[in-house]
C-alpha cells in the first residue's frame, strides 16, 4: 500500500461551535509541492495548521478525525506534538526572524534548544541550511549581524533556513510570499523547485497564478470542503467543477 507524506481521514476542525473544516479526506504524495488554494476564509490556513498540531495552541480549536504523517496518526494520545513540529516545519506569511538574535543564531536556535548539535557541528548545520535556502552567499560575511537590514525575501529565506536546520520531512508554508516584493517572490518560488527533491512542501496560497506556477498538485477549498483536487495542470486546464473553473479564471474571489 502506498504511503503518503500526509493523509487526512474525515478531518473536522471547529473553533468553538463553528465547523471550519468539514470532513476532509486528502492524500499528499511525497516530494511534491502541493498547493491549497481558495478564497479568504475558506479554511486553508486552518487545515495547514492541523498538519503539525499548531492548533493545539488555540484553546478554541477542536480537531476530529485523523492526520497521518508517514502513516502515523499525529493526533494519537501517545504522539509528542513537539516531535511532530520538529518533523513538520512551518513558514508563516510574515517573515519572522527573531530580531534579538543574529543571523547565525536565528538558524541555530532550534538545533541548540533541542540539543541536537553544538560547536563545529552546529556551524556546519547553519552553513548547510543557509546554502539550502540559497542565502549563504548573501549573508556569509555578516552572520553576526542582526536580521533587521535584510530584505523581506531574505528574511523569509532565513526563516526557511531555520526550518531546514531541524531536518524536517515536510515543510508547511502559509502564503510565504504574500508580503514580499516580486524579486523576493521569484527567488522563493525557484527555491521550492529545489526543496521538493528532498522534502514535501505544502503551500497555502491566495493566488491561483502562483499555484499554477509552482505546484505539482492542488486542492481547491471552498467553505471548509475540498471541491476538487488533482494534478495542477489538469485542475487548471480541465476542471471538473464549475466552482473550480470560476475560481481559477478569477470569477470567484
Swiss-Prot record:
Protein's UniProt keywords contain Translocase: yes
EC code: 7.3.2.1
InterPro entries xref list: AAA+_ATPase, ABC_transporter-like_ATP-bd, ABC_transporter-like_CS, P-loop_NTPase, PstB-like
Cell compartments where the protein resides: Cell membrane
Binding-site residues for ATP, renumbered to this chain: 38-45
Membrane topology category: Peripheral membrane protein
Family under the similarity heading: Belongs to the ABC transporter superfamily. Phosphate importer (TC 3.A.1.7) family.
UniProt name for this protein: Phosphate import ATP-binding protein PstB
UniProt lineage: Archaea, Methanobacteriati, Methanobacteriota, Thermococci, Thermococcales
